[in-house]
Amino acid sequence: MGTFLKVKIIGIAVFLCLFSMACNGKDFHGFQSSVTFSRDESLWVKSKRLTASLGYRFNQKRYLGLGCGVSWQLGYNADLRPNYPVTNGVLNSFPIFVDYVRNFQFKRNRRHGFLLGAEAGVTWFDKPIFPNEDYVLNPHLLLKMGFDVSVANKFGVVFGLNAYHLSSPRGIGFFIGIRY
C-alpha cells in the first residue's frame, strides 16, 4: 500500500473522530465513528481489511452506519479451487457497506457490553478475483459478534469475531477497532 493511501486513511480517521466529537452531546446518542482492522481467513483466501464508518447511535443499544475502507486479499489455495490457475500477489479491494450493531450492556456496568452486528455491502476489486472470470464487484454480508469496552466518556475499544457469507472469500476472522 502506498504512502499516499496511508496518509488518506489516517486523515479520514482523524476527520471522523473530530466530527463525531463535535456533534455528540453528553447523551450516549448522536453521530459516532469508528475505525476497524480485521483479519479474515477462509479455506482458500487470506484477507486484511481497514475500514472507517460514520453512523448514528440512536441510543446506547443501537447503531446504524455507512462505511468504506480498503482491503487486501492474498493469493488462494489452488488445491481447493482446482479449476483456477494460482494467483500470486495481492488483490486490492475497496468495500462500501451499511453497518448495524446492537449492543447488550452488562447489568453491573452499563458502559461495557456484548455486541452483535451485520454489515452488508459490495466490494470493488481493482482486477478480477479469479483469472477465468471478469467481475470486479463482489457483494458481501459480514456477521460479527464481540465486545464493546468503554475506555473514557464516549471512546471505546471493540473486538471480536466475524464471519463472511454471500461473498467469494467466505471465511471467519477477528476484528479490533476503536469507536468514538
Walk through the language-model features, giving the residues of each.
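Cleavable N-terminal export/targeting peptides
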Residues: 1-29
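Short N-terminal segments immediately surrounding and downstream of signal-peptide cleavage
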Residues: 25-41
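Transmembrane beta-barrel architecture of outer-membrane proteins
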Residues: 32, 47-49, 93-97, 138-142, ...
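Gram-negative (and chloroplast) outer-membrane scaffold detector with strong preference
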Residues: 37-41, 53-131, 138, 149-155, ...
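Surface-exposed extracellular loop regions of Gram-negative outer-membrane beta-barrel proteins
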Residues: 145-147
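Short, exposed beta-strand-loop hairpins at the edges of beta-sheets
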Residues: 161-168
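Outer-membrane beta-barrel "beta-signal"
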Residues: 169-180
